[in-house]
UniProtKB/Swiss-Prot annotation:
Disulfide bonds: none annotated. It holds the Pfam family OB_RNB. One of its GO terms (cellular component) is cytosol. Signal peptide: none annotated. The gene is rnb. Residues 190-516 form the RNB domain. Coiled coil: none annotated. This is Exoribonuclease 2. It is found in: Cytoplasm. Involved in mRNA degradation. Hydrolyzes single-stranded polyribonucleotides processively in the 3' to 5' direction. InterPro entries: CSD, NA-bd_OB-fold, RNase_B_OB_dom, RNase_II, RNase_II/R, RNase_II/R_CS, RNase_II/RNase_R, RNR_Ribonuclease.
Length: 644
């Protein structure tokens, strides 16, 4: 009787339109219920039965109902699923396959089967790539996924690498060397510098050596520095298949234990690498460095043949300069080059301290792995004098390239950083004012004003203020037009010194060569800058994910013990504090209840970067404290710490 009743249909439509609805993102919990987060301030409870229809991270619309004076959300429509392509672990039960996503807040056991063409037999614990095919909010009865690839087997000790690379859709191996690749020479003949005593300084294990340096004394206490950089663009013409591969990869991917090169290893580790006692093509920059650290306006770029006279290691060179250890340079000529480079480093560093900015030295942490991929040790490698010598030479060369490209072409690939966000600078000024540092907002938006503030902050006893105002700064980015780099305190900066490892540096090589009659200049487009930024983000996330996994493996035996670790507070949020363990670099989380058990007496404030207990400040960002490890959660590779 009511089947086609227009009044009833109208009433249904009216009720539907009057029912309040919201859009938001589902946040799962480990207890079965969840929340629909509409914005930073507003969220709605989702009961366990309704959570079975959605997943953590799904963007949905939901009906809002009130039950027992509490607003709850009932999922109604899927706007954007959180899971599309994902990595998971296979479960096999009664010959039926399921996959559990590798995500800390997604525990759904999703029915699955391999898609057509995936022929492997799967076993419980295997890692796989899967794609979602069905979702309850799309009218399907249940979640369902298809396995599109096997990542690795359950017992593979190298799973951290393969799973991470698959998660970020990154290559597992070096590109293959195409047939017929040869050195392409056009334009002016290369200058023969093979008689000069060039040296390379790098890590002892490095094979892909980009840079070699030669120094000669000049009148009035100056130095003539020649920086020779590997010349892969002589082997890789623009637009060639190999160039397309390099553009796609964008960078060599450095992960703990090994790297995945941007170019075939025959090029990156051999034909292009500036190996000792091997004649190699190079793009060179020669510039005069004055005794006060300034650069003369005589930078000249040219192609050359060079022969490195020694592959030196950072630690050996540093030890020798600091009169430590037994290592000695092979020849007096190499010793002279080290001394000259040391002198130039001191002059340039002093100039940058006064007129630009110098980053604070932070140690590197190196995983020592055995043949099974397990971590035997984590070694702290402080940045020493030899590292700084190479850094100063490369910064000098990049400044020269930035100026030559700016004046000669008006474009290139520039690293730019504009300091404070103009929309947020007043907040930074207010924080500085509360700490008795008076600055003018307009000054902070200039390169000079930014540098002056950074020097004042670097002189502070702790990093607290620096970390507080860092969030009001813009991010560094790659631009096709010249611009300042506030973080370095320089008016222009364009890198070209790592072309074996960075595609952006290859582009700048081609532009610099065009200015000296080798090839044509083609202005890079915005698509390239976006690709470089995206690939850099992917590689950094991959390095972090592998590192987190290895840290969890390494620290798991110490969880629950009395072992103490010195740690620095790097972030404070409502839920607790993130700290970095200083003797190995691992990041751990200290939950708020571990700081103080009475929640109402505890305030963890991200805005002030402090932790207060009963109104008294107990911790602030940048403080160091001792912690023990309460727990290591292997399922999400996280470390939970407790203050001592």
């Amino acid at each position: 009787m009511f089947q086609d009743n227009p009044l009833l249909a109208q009433l249904k439509q009216q009720l539907h339109s009057q029912t309040p609805r919201v859009e938001g993102v589902v946040k799962g919990t480990e207890k079965g219920f969840g929340f629909l987060e509409v914005d930073a301030q507003k969220s709605y409870f989702i009961s366990p039965p309704f959570m079975k229809k959605v997943m953590h991270g799904d963007k949905i619309s939901a009906v809002v109902r009130t039950e027992k004076e509490r607003e709850i959300a009932e999922p109604e429509e899927l706007i954007e699923p959180f899971l599309t392509r994902f990595i998971g672990r296979v479960q096999v039960k009664d010959e039926r396959l399921a996959v559990v996503p590798d995500h800390p807040l997604i525990k759904e056991v999703i029915p699955t089967r391999p898609q057509h063409g995936v022929d492997q037999m799967f076993q419980t614990g295997d890692w796989a790539v899967a794609e979602m095919r069905r979702h309850p909010l799309k009218g399907d009865r249940q979640f369902y996924a298809e396995i599109t690839a096997l990542v690795t087997r359950a017992d593979d000790h190298f799973a951290p690498w393969w799973v991470t690379l698959a998660r970020h859709n990154l290559e597992r191996a070096a590109p293959t060397m195409p047939e017929g690749v040869s050195l392409q020479e056009d334009g002016p003949a290369r200058e023969d510098l093979t008689a000069l005593d060039f040296i390379t300084i790098d890590s002892a294990s490095t094979e892909d050596m980009d840079d070699a340096i030669h120094l000669a004394p000049a009148p009035n206490g100056a130095w003539v520095m020649t920086v020779a950089i590997a010349d892969p663009t002589a082997w890789v013409p623009a637009g060639s298949p190999l160039d397309n591969i390099a553009r796609e990869r964008a960078f060599t991917n450095y992960l703990p234990g090994f790297n995945i090169p941007m170019l075939p290893r025959a090029l990156s580790d051999d034909l292009c690498s500036l190996r000792a006692h091997e004649r190699r093509p190079a793009l060179a920059c020669r510039v005069t460095v004055r005794p006060n650290g300034t650069l003369a306006d005589d930078a000249r770029f040219f192609t050359a043949w060079i022969e490195s006279k020694g592959k030196l290691a950072y630690d050996n060179v540093s030890d020798w300069l600091e009169n430590l250890g037994s290592w000695q340079p092979e020849t007096e000529a190499i010793a002279d080059q080290i001394r000259l480079l040391h002198d130039v480093c001191l002059a340039r560093s002093a100039w940058r301290q006064r007129h630009a900015l110098v980053f604070k030295d932070r140690p590197d942490y190196r995983f020592v792995l055995n043949e099974k991929g397990n971590v035997d040790d984590i070694v702290v490698e402080p940045r020493r004098i030899a590292n700084r010598m190479i850094e100063e030479a490369m910064i000098t060369a990049n400044v020269c390239a930035a100026r030559v490209l700016r004046d000669g072409l008006g474009y290139g690939l520039y690293n730019v950083h504009h300091g404070f966000d103009p929309l947020l600078v007043d907040q930074a000024v207010a924080i500085l004012h509360s700490h008795q540092i008076e600055v003018d907002p307009a000054d902070l938006l200039t390169l000079e004003g930014f540098c002056a503030l950074r020097r004042r902050l670097d002189a502070q006893p702790t990093s607290y203020l620096d970390s507080r105002i860092r969030r009001f700064q813009t991010f560094a980015e790659v631009s096709t037009v010249p611009g300042p780099h506030f973080g370095l305190g320089l008016d222009a900066y364009a890198t070209w010194t790592s072309p074996i490892r960075k595609y952006g540096d290859m582009i700048n090589h081609r532009l610099l060569k065009a200015l000296i009659g080798v090839g044509d200049a083609e202005r890079p487009n915005e698509e390239v800058t976006l690709r470089l930024a995206e690939r850099r983000r992917q590689n950094r996330m991959a390095e972090r994910d592998v590192g987190d996994w290895l840290y969890a493996r390494f620290l798991q035996p110490k969880a629950g013990s009395d072992s103490r670790f010195a740690a620095e507070i790097i972030d404070i949020s409502r839920g607790g504090m993130r700290v970095r363990l200083l003797n190995n670099g691992a990041v751990a989380f200290i939950p708020a209840p571990f700081i103080h058990s009475v929640r109402d007496e505890l305030v963890c404030s991200q805005d002030t970067g402090t932790v207060q207990v009963k109104g008294e400040e107990r911790y602030r960002q940048g403080d160091t404290l001792d912690v023990t490890l309460a727990e290591v959660r292997m399922e999400n590779r996280s470390v939970i710490a407790r203050p001592v």
